[in-house]
Amino acid sequence: MKIYIFLLLFISNMGFSASINHIGQKGKASEVNRVIEIKMYDNYFEPNEINIKKGETIKFLIKNFGSLVHEFNIATNKMHLNHQTEMLKMMENEILLGDKIDYEKMKEIAKTDHSMAHSHSNSVLLEPNKSGEIIWKFNTETKLEAACNVPGHYESNMIAKINFN
């Protein structure tokens, strides 16, 4: 029984790692090649295109200048579409409140539903006037975009194209 549980946990963690490793991986501060500042406004990013070289480790300094909660998330289009269901659930559970994030409720609900923790290394969720950072190693040339998956924002084209040079 113990072996069965171990294998189940091992295989499920392998699947999770593989699902994100195909887009890159969390970078190390000591390996940062460049810093890119990202400004989030209500339903758009500046810059709206990001040029990357395969193998680069980028430190993204992200600030939300908008009046709403926004997310900066590095992923494929398909991953964004899947993540949007989690973000909708966060709104339905009143974790996302337009211009606020209820961190206490997030923490409580995440005890039974880990997807509500929003603890992804490729993403940051910010209230207005807040800042965050992501250090990301682009070790693949998979077609990526940075987007906000707060309900309605992706549909409003809050997307930054990631180009590989």
Regions found by a protein language model. Give the residues of each.
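Beta-strand signatures of extracellular beta-sandwich domains
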Residues: 71-75
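Envelope-exposed proteins and targeting segments
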Residues: 32-36, 54-58, 68-70, 130-132, ...
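N-terminal edge beta-strand
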Residues: 26-57, 115
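Short edge-strand/loop segments of extracellular domains
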Residues: 76-82, 163-165
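Extracellular/periplasmic metallocenter environments
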Residues: 18-25, 44, 65-69, 98-110, ...
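Outer-membrane beta-barrel and related beta-rich outer-membrane complex signature
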Residues: 84-88
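Aromatic/hydrophobic beta-strand junction motif of beta-rich domains
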Residues: 60-62
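Sec-dependent N-terminal signal peptides
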Residues: 4-13
